[in-house]
Amino acid sequence: MIDIIKVSNNSELREFVMFPFKLYKGSKYWVPPIIEQEMNSFNKDLNPNLKNADVELYVASKNDEIVGRIAVIVNWYEVKEQKTSKIRFGWFDFIDDFEVSKVLLDKVVESGNKNKLKYMEGPMGFSNLDKVGVLTSGFEIIGTMITAYNHSYYVNHYEKYGLTSEKNFHEKTFMFKDIDTAYYEKMSKIVKTRNKLNEVNFTSTREVMKRTNEMFDLFNRSYAKLSSFVKIIRSKKNLWKKNT
């Protein structure tokens, strides 16, 4: 029998955060997250995304042992302002037992129905600044910063539940010694000249902070057309600057 437990205190949150350390113990390719940062991701005082989002965390337990976890997320800015009727899920890890993954995904469906949302998408976080995606190949390659590493059996669980791939992303690794930089240096000069661009060199954090609003605005314009993009709003900008 699988028991589903809703995380309700710091002790349970730590168990939620630490589960992958057991699941991927001994893996040469999984890169462990910084525990404090993971804990802070679910702290409303430290994560500005939680000002506009609701999250419910669940762990699955079998024989008094944690065997899976999931975060169920509603980003209300995305739902109300961007008119995207979607519930998100992330931090989704589980042993190779479909009963476990199914009961966790059922919590996403349950919350989506409760909030009258039309579809679910994941794994992803609160925004595009969190880890995203399911690894479908390259399991023998060390994980990257933006994509989550997972066991090969994950794909079968998603497909068995009835989920389909919405986007496919390809990551490539290039050795510096194999790259001829002459072409890129030439194109860089052309782009700078044509658009009258200059590098800005900063010598202190204070100088950087003066231009952070411009950087956030550029980020919003640059990635607006990306799938599942959520705009960085003013309150998030201010809180991030305050915590920097």
Where would I find each of the regions flagged by the language model?
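Extracellular structured ligand-interaction cores
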Residues: V55, K86, K167-E171
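Acyl-donor binding region in acyl/amide transferases
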Residues: E81-G162
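Short amphipathic alpha-helix that is part of the acyltransferase structural core
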Residues: M1-D45, N195-L239
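A short helix-loop-beta-strand connector motif used in the catalytic cores of GNAT acetyltransferases and
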Residues: N43-V59, K242-T244
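Acyltransferase donor/substrate-recognition loop-hinge adjacent to the catalytic core
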Residues: I2, A148-F229
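Conserved beta-strand in the GNAT
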Residues: V59, E65-N75
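Membrane-embedded alpha-helical bundles of multi-pass transporters/translocases
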Residues: F19, K51-V55, R69
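Feature marks short, surface-exposed loop/turn motifs that line or immediately flank catalytic pockets
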Residues: W76, F126-D130, D178
